[in-house]
């Protein structure tokens, strides 16, 4: 399994364990980066694009995900 696929599979499991939706994750990750709903929607759609195409997100997104979910970086790539 490729690292990017493992990342998305593990993130999906972690979100389920924390009872969070993808939209809630996006709100936490992009907090402070948008004012209007259209700006949030653009960021959320970008996250969905990465997820649906199983692309590895930008390093700063990964770091932010680790921070807002209060998890270890390794949790996203092992399991």
PLM features per residue range, with description:
Residues 28, 46, 50, 79:
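Residues in the recognition helix of alpha-helical DNA-binding motifs
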Residues 9, 20, 42, 57-60:
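Residue-level signal for the short linker/turn that defines the boundary of a DNA-recognition helix
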Residues 9-10, 46, 64:
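Pre-recognition alpha-helix immediately N-terminal to the DNA-recognition helix
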Residues 27, 38, 67:
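Alpha-helical residues within the helix-turn-helix
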Residues 34-57:
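Recognition helix of helix-turn-helix/homeodomain-like DNA-binding domains
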Residues 1-29:
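A short, Lys/Arg-rich alpha-helix, primarily the initiator
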Residues 58-75:
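DNA major-groove recognition helix of helix-turn-helix/homeodomain DNA-binding modules
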């Amino acid at each position: 399994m490729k690292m990017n696929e493992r990342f998305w599979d593990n993130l999906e499991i972690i979100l389920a364990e924390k009872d969070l939706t993808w939209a809630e994750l996006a709100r936490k990750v992009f907090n402070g980066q948008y004012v209007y709903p259209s700006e949030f929607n653009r960021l959320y759609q970008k996250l969905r694009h990465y997820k649906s195409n199983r692309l590895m997100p930008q390093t700063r997104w990964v770091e932010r995900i680790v921070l807002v979910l209060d998890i270890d970086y390794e949790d996203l790539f092992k399991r």
